[in-house]
Structures are given as C-alpha cells and as structure tokens.
C-alpha cells in the first residue's frame, strides 16, 4: 500500500468540470440554478451521469428501491465502508452546488487515492 503524501492533491479542474456537467442537467436558463426534482427525468439523468463516473472508477455500485445510489471503493479489510456524500436532486430553484459538491467531492477523493495507488484500510463510499 502506498503511504499518504503531502503532495496528494485533488484535481480541482476535474471536480469543477463534473460540477458543471451535473449542473447542466435541469439548468434554469438565465440563472446559475437548476431544477432536478426527485423522481423526475432530470433526476434520473443526473443519477445516470454520477453512476457513469462511478463505473469509470470501478466502484461497486448499488441502487436501492427508491433510487439512492452508493458507489464503494474496496479497502484492504472487510467491514462497513467510511461514507461520504449528499444528494444530487434539488428543490424547484436549487443552486448548482446544492448537494452536488458533497457527492462529487467524495468521488474526487476516491479518484485521487486511486491515481496515487493508495488503497484505504476500510472501503470508501
């Protein structure tokens, strides 16, 4: 296992690009807001996009009966993963970062660890 380094940094451009891509789904024209209400076509499109990024990271993906998506990076040891996250659905006039940053920051951490060859002790979700 690689060790943590003070040189370990997230890719802010990749994170910003993902935030922008997700914010386009349900974007409210003329504003920086978006409307991606739960259980709408926009919500499904947003979840599908996030799932595609999880697949690119080879995460183990589960979707429950109401559409909650969890992607897990395996750790060195079995047991419950350390979880981070939020939501990607919005209220009718939600902001582009509302919930999205909490989900995408977790993916960025996983991608950064993978790129550095670091496998965590516990899984990350």
Question: What does each model-found stretch correspond to?
Answer:
Residues 2-40:
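N-terminal capping segment at the start of a domain
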Residues 3, 20-27, 55-59, 112-119:
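Generic secondary-structure signature for well-ordered alpha-helical cores
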Residues 11-18, 42, 46-50, 109, ...:
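General structural feature for long, well-ordered alpha-helical segments within catalytic domains
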Residues 17-30, 46, 73, 78-82:
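N-terminal glycine-rich anion-binding loops that anchor highly charged ligand groups
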Residues 28-73:
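A non-catalytic alpha/beta surface segment that caps or lines the substrate-entry region
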Residues 38-41, 91-101:
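Short coil/turn segments at secondary-structure boundaries
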Residues 57, 65, 69-97, 106:
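Catalytic-core environment of secreted peptidases
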Residues 84, 96-125:
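Alpha-helical metal-binding/catalytic segments enriched in His/Glu/Asp
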